[in-house]
Amino acid sequence: MITTKSLPLSWEELQQLATFERDTVNGPTNSQTRLRLFGQAESDVRVTLYRDHHAWCPYCQKVWLWLEEKQIPYRIEKVTMFCYGTKEKWYKQKVPSGMLPALELDGQVITESDDILLALEDAFGPLNQVGMGDRRALPLRQLERLLFRGWCTWLCYPTRSQREDQRSREQFTSIVAQVETALANTPGPYFLEEFGIVDVVFT
């Protein structure tokens, strides 16, 4: 026996359901938005994040994640990555190197993701009790740099022999084991007691 509950929805019913609009300014994060307010006034915005169009750049992502986690109102300007085309002239005037990310805070342009995070902590405070310069965060930040370097050495640079490739792979695997050990040192899923700057940096 067929009931009305088991009948498929009509096209008209489906269209009515599709009219839902996501609040990209105050709702969940989304890579397409150009403004995030978290319920505050647009006049409160002190920060502009310059990031890649497609939300692929890991350095942009960690600054983006920090702003989202701290719920700091900010604007987003999207910039072409070097590997995808010509850098916009307006951006090269603002950031001559053309590198991403960049952040404008109260009119001052800051580059390099770690320098940006330090400036954000100075302006708005750390995500929790552990900031970028905390003695508990520093060795883990160094481990993240080792992980990145090991990954790049293994996968991004050409090797001259199979033996050299194997050595790079083993080095990367060894660093991953160190990361796993660091994660296992806390009872929860984060590098320290709670989600914080170290997790943002590893993201």
Segments and roles (model prediction):
Residues 193-203:
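GST superfamily/GST-like fold recognition
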